[in-house]
């Protein structure tokens, strides 16, 4: 049997982390088994579905590199197909027309709730005894079995059973002629030959209804696997209140797709004590039978730890392609200064996100208007004038501009003045970066460049002169 999975988001908002994890699990399962992965846009909610949301979903999938073999399919383009099947079901008797008014159904619901009963349709139109005009408004309901049970073996949760007596006759076509979500899903999974439906646990209650429809139309029932929800650190369902955002917001916040994928795969799945997984390892190892049925808590610190790992372990040239976007957001002109791959090497250990890296790299490329006040007060004092003059001259005299040469120049200045390296290094750091902290001074000065470094030392000496006056 050829494995075929699908990711079927509703385009009513962004691709959130829960949806991204579901997409990842479906994608990994298909890839592990040499199967196919289908992208389907479930846009039957015409009032809430938007093109902007569709674009956001596509952007998120593409950024995560979750490629699909078929699709994207759109349910709104398949209404004729759904209605054809509904008409066949009406003909076969597995569906029927319901003429009950909204008022009657609301009264029925209120009475049932008042009596402590579960609200459900009472089947008044099920046997079709009443005569109605051909053009009288009606919905179409599925004739759900009234006896027996629906049992399915959830690949994550084990056997789950629902009594058919608990299920009412589901509306499958509204009065306006539009087929309903639960019905469209069934026909799509049938037509697209989906073998494994991997989705959130909020769909468990839909499953018995969908299975009954599949059996009624003679379709193969797929294997189901329902993934547990993601919680915030307070144990409540993850929401905007916890900072839960769309996948692309993580891009905007400076995370690499590899870090987010690694983090998401571990939210409910494990392979021993291993924490770091490459995409190839995920595809090779992922199986549904080890996915936890317990909810997982989202931990931003863990995600940052993974992101820091990938910033420093992936090829700097690759990381630089993602850093470029953040540099552009900071409006930094990088035409003069180090290559971005070199910048990744310089700042990688100090930065947890690419956004942080972009925000802290401007001094490599552009002049700063003033020194950090605290750093200048502490290190650009009159006593620093001579160390800066000596190291300036030695840097200016270098014919071969290398990081090792810069280190030797700083050491030579300290030796000449008979002071520790810090007496030269700290004023030099503030002079060339404008701040009191930076990566290793020799590689920093080297990356800034000879002419720019010497000019900044001159600027620092002028600043010191104003303090001496």
From Swiss-Prot:
The keyword Nucleotide-binding applies. GO terms for cellular component: cytosol. It holds the Pfam family Anticodon_2. It comes from the Bacteria. Keywords: Aminoacyl-tRNA synthetase, ATP-binding, Cytoplasm, Ligase, Metal-binding, Nucleotide-binding, Protein biosynthesis, Zinc. Its EC number is 6.1.1.17. Zn(2+) binds at residues 98, 100, 125, 127. InterPro entries: aa-tRNA-synth_I_cd-bd, aa-tRNA-synth_I_codon-bd_sub2, aa-tRNA-synth_I_CS, aa_tRNA-synth_I_cd-bd_sf, Glu-tRNA-ligase_bac/mito, Glu/Gln-tRNA-synth, Glu/Gln-tRNA-synth_Ib_cat-dom, GluQ/Sye. Its main location: cytoplasm. A motif ('HIGH' region) lies at residues 9-19. One of its GO terms (biological process) is glutamyl-tRNA aminoacylation. Its cofactor is Zn(2+). ATP binds at residue 240. NCBIfam families: gltX_bact (TIGR00464). Catalyzes the attachment of glutamate to tRNA(Glu) in a two-step reaction: glutamate is first activated by ATP to form Glu-AMP and then transferred to the acceptor end of tRNA(Glu). PANTHER family: GLUTAMATE--TRNA LIGASE, GLUTAMATE--TRNA LIGASE, MITOCHONDRIAL-RELATED. Belongs to the class-I aminoacyl-tRNA synthetase family. Glutamate--tRNA ligase type 1 subfamily. This is Glutamate--tRNA ligase.
């Amino acid at each position: 049997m050829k494995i075929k999975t699908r990711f079927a988001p509703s385009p009513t908002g962004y691709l959130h982390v829960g949806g991204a994890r579901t997409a990842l699990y479906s994608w990994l399962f298909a890839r592990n088994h040499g199967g196919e992965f289908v992208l389907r846009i479930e846009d039957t909610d015409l009032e809430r579905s938007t093109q902007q949301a569709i674009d956001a979903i596509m952007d998120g999938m593409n950024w995560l590199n979750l490629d699909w073999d078929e699709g994207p399919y759109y349910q709104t383009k398949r209404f004729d197909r759904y209605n054809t099947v509904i008409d066949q079901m009406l003909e076969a008797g597995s569906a029927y027309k319901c003429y009950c008014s909204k008022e009657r159904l609301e009264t029925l619901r209120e009475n049932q709730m008042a009596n402590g009963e579960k609200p459900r349709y009472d089947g008044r139109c099920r046997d079709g005894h009443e005569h109605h005009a051909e053009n009288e408004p009606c919905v179409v309901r599925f004739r759900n079995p009234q006896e027996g049970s629906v049992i399915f073996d959830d690949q994550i949760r084990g056997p789950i059973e629902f009594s058919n007596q608990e299920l009412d006759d589901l509306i499958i076509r509204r009065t306006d002629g539009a087929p309903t979500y639960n019905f469209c899903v069934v026909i799509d999974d049938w037509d697209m030959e989906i073998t494994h439906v991997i989705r959130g646990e909020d769909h468990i209650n839909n499953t018995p209804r969908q299975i009954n429809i599949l059996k009624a139309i003679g379709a193969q029932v797929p294997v189901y696997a329902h993934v547990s929800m993601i919680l915030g650190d307070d144990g409540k369902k993850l929401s905007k209140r916890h900072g839960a955002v769309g996948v692309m917001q993580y891009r905007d916040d400076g995370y690499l797709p590899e870090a987010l994928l690694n983090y998401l795969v571990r939210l409910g799945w494990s392979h021993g004590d291993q924490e770091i997984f490459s995409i190839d390892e995920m595809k090779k190892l992922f199986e549904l039978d080890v996915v936890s049925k317990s909810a997982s808590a989202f931990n931003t610190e863990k995600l940052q730890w993974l992101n820091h790992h990938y910033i420093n372990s992936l090829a700097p040239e690759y990381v630089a392609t993602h850093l470029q976007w953040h540099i552009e957001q900071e409006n930094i002109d990088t035409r003069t200064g180090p290559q971005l791959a070199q910048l990744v090497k310089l700042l990688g250990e100090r930065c947890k996100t690419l956004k942080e890296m972009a925000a802290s790299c401007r001094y490599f490329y552009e002049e700063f208007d003033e020194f950090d006040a605290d750093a200048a007060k502490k290190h650009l004092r009159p006593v620093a004038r001579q160390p800066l003059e000596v190291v300036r001259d030695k840097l200016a005299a270098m014919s071969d501009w290398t990081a090792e040469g810069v280190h030797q120049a700083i050491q030579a200045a300290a030796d000449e003045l008979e002071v520790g390296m810090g007496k030269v290094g700290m004023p030099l750091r503030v002079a060339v970066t404008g701040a009191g902290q930076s990566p290793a001074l020799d590689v920093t000065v080297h990356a800034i460049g000879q002419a720019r470094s010497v000019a900044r030392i001159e600027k620092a000496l002028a600043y010191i002169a104003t303090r001496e006056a």
